[in-house]
Amino acid sequence: MAQDRKKVLVLGAGYAGLQTVTKLQKAISTEEAEITLINKNEYHYEATWLHEASAGTLNYEDVLYPVESVLKKDKVNFVQAEVTKIDRDAKKVETNQGIYDFDILVVALGFVSETFGIEGMKDHAFQIENVITARELSRHIEDKFANYAASKEKDDNDLSILVGGAGFTGVEFLGELTDRIPELCSKYGVDQNKVKITCVEAAPKMLPMFSEELVNHAVSYLEDRGVEFKIATPIVACNEKGFVVEVDGEKQQLNAGTSVWAAGVRGSKLMEESFEGVKRGRIVTKQDLTINGYDNIFVIGDCSAFIPAGEERPLPTTAQIAMQQGESVAKNIKRILNGESTEEFEYVDRGTVCSLGSHDGVGMVFDKPIAGKKAAFMKKVIDTRAVFKIGGIGLAFKKGKF
């Protein structure tokens, strides 16, 4: 019986990969399959909380927990390694710690920052990408305030922050900044009126997923707390001084001591090296989340471009979708092991909430708009539910937002 065991290999312990494994370990026995999870870090981090850790309103350690803390060690073999190559036909995955065979593969390698080729953006701007970048950014912001307070010759740029992008991540980061700035001003004796936060967005509208009414609420709330918006203003370069933007065909330099890029992500760069037809690290999947020509390879999360039947555009890359994909794949792997056909993935949109710091927010929940404290509360519910779905009540109690 043991020789008939299938080898299930899961790459990545983000929302999609970890949800797959935690559901699968409950659904199958050790006689049915050998599950191996490979992740480059020993920890999982809540990617949707990175804006808080980046602003310094949440300690970076509160964003992460050990991967093995949610695994059944008799069911899952965890390997801390970096994936370097996926060989679909040989059914092998190469890592910096060795080569692993598979019968069924789940690719959930997550995202990296996408700067769209903007000159200097990778070199001179902080990225909201992982817990390491979050820790670096929050420390840098505080260091700038400390330096301003200690310097005899004040540099106002120490108190100036540029944020590129007024999408979900950018706006949530701005909200956290408006919570953090008063604390820093109080700690270092800085006049808050001297702090300048500017958000630059190339598109004609911020938060394009929300109605004008919700967007106006977000803009008003953040502007009242000191944020200046430059909408329909493309960033053409980033340098050590800040952003270079284009206004009416002319280039302008915006100066700041801190530049942050929060305007784009893409799937893992390993995707282009491993598969054909990949765009920005994402591959179009079939309706059951496998890829063309390979019924034994699932691709989910940030690396997946899933187009629902009858639709033209793929679903966005969100934690909610990634976790639902993980559940679906776990069920389908169980079906494959039972000799049954796979089922199509059906996404259930339970709503989206964008936080504006810890006390306000905007969102759509079950097709109803919400804003203010109600939205802020709902965001905490969503964050806590995500932890509960993977780690149960114990992890939710330890890491949740209540």
From Swiss-Prot:
InterPro entries per UniProt: FAD/NAD-bd_sf (IPR036188), FAD/NAD-binding_dom (IPR023753), NADH-Q_oxidoreductase (IPR051169)
Binding site residues for FAD: 12-16, 39-40, 83, 302, 319-320, 379
Highest taxon of the lineage: Bacteria
Main localisation: membrane
Cofactor note: Binds 1 FAD per subunit.
Record bears the keyword Iron-sulfur: no
Family per record: Belongs to the NADH dehydrogenase family.
Name of protein: Type II NADH:quinone oxidoreductase
Free-text function comment from the UniProt entry: Alternative, nonproton pumping NADH:quinone oxidoreductase that delivers electrons to the respiratory chain by oxidation of NADH and reduction of quinones, and contributes to the regeneration of NAD(+).
Active site: residue positions: 172
Keywords annotated in UniProt: Cell membrane, FAD, Flavoprotein, Membrane, NAD, Oxidoreductase
Catalysed reactions, as listed in the record: a quinone + NADH + H(+) = a quinol + NAD(+)
Example GO biological process: aerobic electron transport chain
PANTHER family xref list: 64 KDA MITOCHONDRIAL NADH DEHYDROGENASE (EUROFUNG), APOPTOSIS-INDUCING FACTOR 1
GO CC list: plasma membrane
Alphabetized GO MF terms: NAD(P)H dehydrogenase (quinone) activity; NADH:ubiquinone reductase (non-electrogenic) activity
Obligatory cofactor(s): FAD
Annotated EC: 1.6.5.9
Subcellular location: Cell membrane
